[in-house]
């Protein structure tokens, strides 16, 4: 990290500590789940295809975001959602020797590196989603180490491919991108190519929602909508796009949801791209609901998205590494288990991976 970045992080850390010292000044704001559900249901699906950039800024035309920095400050100055001590202490074990298991596993697989970073091998090609190997995502510090080192990933044979969903620091880590092999091909939403070039990566494919590009023989990448937003210290709010992706090969389809709130787009994606095998969907940073509801999904909404996509299996992402909301980093499995019972979801279709776990995809039924 260079000197200017260290100063920026230090200033941000001081501000955050001041906010934390002043916390608990405001009560928890109530949230009307039924009203939110009605708002989602009333959105016009045609707007998923509408223009989504105006005056240099991107937006979600089916439901523009209303939350802003003032709401963030209120969250920081509010009472925190309370959890049991055992929930607060629950952390994931990291499985060792992933590199050895990669070498000994034939065929396709999905391996979890941590947070939203997954290593995927399809038809001999390697893909990684939103790689972050750094100790911090700007401010939040890792609770668990990565299940694979960046050096091991770089040493894997063949060309590497990366999917970047948006510009937030827990999904776009500059140091990790900079250290990738120079010939890594990187797929990004609109507006992020210049940043990738500045980090030393020239093989960059910039994509808009609903755009499909070839990634080789019998391989396609589809850029799809998500309900989120973007900002970095060096970039203004929403000057770059956010997205989810569908990776299509001759044998299977893998959907990577990036970061998103629940929205009508999941139904349209499931309708347009039937037969999704694995849906990698985020379950993190959902408390407090009054602040997080628009851009993040809780366990129930993640299962609703899984149902809308009509995918065969659901793999939860974006948990277990960084504490970004009020909820503990290890809460996702228990929250999903409860939500699955409530929604009558077959638990066999939910694959909760461990950090460093490798899931072979040779069989149509990974169980």
Where in this protein do the model-derived segments appear?
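Catalytic core of the metallo-beta-lactamase
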Residues: 117-121, 215-277, 293, 297-301
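Divalent metal-coordination and catalytic microenvironments
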Residues: 120, 130, 166, 221, ...
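Active-site metal-binding loops of divalent metal-dependent hydrolases
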Residues: 131-133, 167, 226-227, 258-260, ...
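Cap/insert and terminal regions of metallo-dependent hydrolase folds
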Residues: 25-43, 52-56, 161, 185, ...
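Acidic/histidine-rich helix-loop elements
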Residues: 132-150, 229-236, 287-296, 323
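Active-site metal-binding motif and surrounding structural segment of the metallo-beta-lactamase
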Residues: 49, 141-188, 203, 274-280
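Metallo-beta-lactamase
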Residues: 9-13, 23-137, 141-144, 150, 189-252, 335-357, 361-364, ...
């Amino acid at each position: 990290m260079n000197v200017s970045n260290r100063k920026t992080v230090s200033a941000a850390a001081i501000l955050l500590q001041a906010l934390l010292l002043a916390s608990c000044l405001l009560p928890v704001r109530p949230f009307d789940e039924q009203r939110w559900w009605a708002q989602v249901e009333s959105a016009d699906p045609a707007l998923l295809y509408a223009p989504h950039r105006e005056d240099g800024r991107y937006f979600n035309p089916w439901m523009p975001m209303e939350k802003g920095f003032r709401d963030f400050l209120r969250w920081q100055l509010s009472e925190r959602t309370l959890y049991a001590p055992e929930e607060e202490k629950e952390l994931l074990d990291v499985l060792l020797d992933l590199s050895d298991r990669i070498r000994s596993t034939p065929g396709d697989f999905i391996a979890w590196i941590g947070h939203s970073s997954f290593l995927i091998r399809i038809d001999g090609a390697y893909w990684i989603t939103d790689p972050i190997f750094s100790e911090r995502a700007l401010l939040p510090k890792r609770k668990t180490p990565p299940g694979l080192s960046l050096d091991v990933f770089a040493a894997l044979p063949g060309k590497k491919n990366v999917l970047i969903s948006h510009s937030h620091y827990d999904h776009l880590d500059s140091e990790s991108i900079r250290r990738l092999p120079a010939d890594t091909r990187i797929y990004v939403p609109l507006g992020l190519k210049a940043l990738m070039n500045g980090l030393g990566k020239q093989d960059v494919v910039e994509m808009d929602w609903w755009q499909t590009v070839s990634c080789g023989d019998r391989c396609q990448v589809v850029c799809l909508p998500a309900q989120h937003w973007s900002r970095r210290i060096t970039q203004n709010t929403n000057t770059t796009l956010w997205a989810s992706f569908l990776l299509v090969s001759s044998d299977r389809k893998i959907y990577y949801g990036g970061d998103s709130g629940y929205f009508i787009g999941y139904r349209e994606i499931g309708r347009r791209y039937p037969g999704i095998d694995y849906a990698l969907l985020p379950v993190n940073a959902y408390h407090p609901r009054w602040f997080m509801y628009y851009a993040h999904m809780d366990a129930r909404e993640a299962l609703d998205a899984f149902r809308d996509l009509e995918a065969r299996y659901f793999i939860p992402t974006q948990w277990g590494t960084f504490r970004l909301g009020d909820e503990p980093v290890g809460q996702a499995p228990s929250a999903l288990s409860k939500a699955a019972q409530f929604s009558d979801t077959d638990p066999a279709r939910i694959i909760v991976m461990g950090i460093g776990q490798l899931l072979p995809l040779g069989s149509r039924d990974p169980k």
